[in-house]
Amino acid sequence: MDETIGMKKEFHDISVGDIEVGESAPVTEDDKMLLNLGYKQEFKREFSLLAVFGQSFGSMGLCPSLVGSMAFSMNCGAGGMVWSWFVGATCLLPIAFALSELASSMPTSGSLYFWTAYLSPPKYRAFLSWFLGYVLALAYSTGFASTIYAAAGLVQATASVANPSYAPTKYEEYGIYVALSFACSALIVLPTKFLARFSSFNVVFQICTILIFIISLAASSTSETRNTGSYIFGNFENYSGWTNMGWSFILCFTTPVWVLSGFESCATIVEEAKNASKAAPIAIISSLTVSLFMGFCIMITIAGTMGHDFSSILNTPYGEPVSQVLYNNLGKRGAVGVSAVLIIALCFNCSALCLASSREIFAFARDKGLPGSWIFRKLTPGGIPLNAILLVNLYTIIVGLLMLVNVTAISSIFNLAIIAFFISYSLPLVCRLLFNRLNPGKFYCGKFSKPISIVAVAWLWFMALMLLFPSYQNPNKVEMNWAIVVLGFTVFFCVGYYYLPKYGGKTFFKGPVKTVDENVTEGVTVDFQADHVSKEDDGKSYN
């Protein structure tokens, strides 16, 4: 396949960045592909393959995120912890392959939102891209908020280990949450070149965190805390609020799907990446695969060093089960030291998520999809979408008010983030299957492409439905799953705003809008708005 879709002539007289005619600066294949998709180059391409991988790997923040959400996977004993991770994470691989094909074909920061628009017929394009834009913004923003909440919980647990008399009020907990939100966001207002270096550094730091965690627990375990292989892989007990063991095991999938959600986030920074159509699919698949096996090792380590008193771990006074495991094996100082490293790693994870969220909001605002889009599509002189970053923080602060209700209410944001991500993942794949409009990029699965997408959609819909269920079999209004409330409000606002008479999105939103000047695109086919025929089944090779 040609390096660009629908490209009719080469560009040798276009200046990258300001897109002016008459300059002699070289134009890369990345710039040509972006031009063909209808967008001028606004970001600087500073992200190497390692940095792109670091964005996805860092967004997952494997070890600290797993530690912060461990309680969800402990509903079925040690065996349930270990196997729910392996099964849940493995089932995400078809999704990674399916999304990698789209990322390679359409490397733009709009990612899932743009892909949905591109793959849908003109009749449905505007509404579907509008809907997906809002759900995806909800997914990334809630993913950031839930990770900030996990970080705040880890900070409080560490403080409790260091000082057993420490007992923060819910308002103090909320204050820690807000402070962490701004602190983690501050890191990504720096220039793109720094962000690329930070992303690469984050890979090294996250891997070092994993090694520190595993080695410290394995080396310090005693006969009282060390468990046998039969216990690690074969102990199944029901500690959930449901009587059915099988359903309790399915609920354990919350940990792997939450921790690993965001593995495609590198697609939101492809306009800042070099050789984006290759780098994005490599980063998506490799980051998920590495996280799957490293996470499995972490789970085995925790299950092998937690002892047999599962109830005391679950009901720890520190608030975080893994904090109790660290204390039992390492003592106070060791537990605080390892927890400090986990907190730093989790904050880096939060920064990576905020980066992805702000880029998606910028891309959606660039296409006039948000109220006040002209505000959120602005870049600073350094090329940073500062207003979009502030919007992410505003949402995080508001949704964090659920902390003042109860733990069950705020815990629902974990489910909400996953559900929103899974809806966002599934919609472009459904369009790709129904309308057969994919022009394959450099990464393509050939005859296995459609079967992989079908399996991916089936798993996404199953998990999205499962995560709407409450944590308890007969919940009261306090124990209900609040995810459906926030998701329902978002869908209601999205659809209502779109069809609002005279002022709604239907009157002005047409889907992704090209930002390339006409004098630049002269002689170029930017065929996004035109109907097109898929090249997927023409018998040619696209690798």
UniProtKB/Swiss-Prot annotation:
It comes from the Eukaryota. One of its GO terms (biological process) is gamma-aminobutyric acid transport. Signal peptide: none annotated. Pfam families: AA_permease_2 (PF13520). Keywords: Amino-acid transport, Glycoprotein, Membrane, Transmembrane, Transmembrane helix, Transport. It is a multi-pass membrane protein. This is Uncharacterized amino-acid permease PB24D3.02c. It comes from Schizosaccharomyces pombe (strain 972 / ATCC 24843).
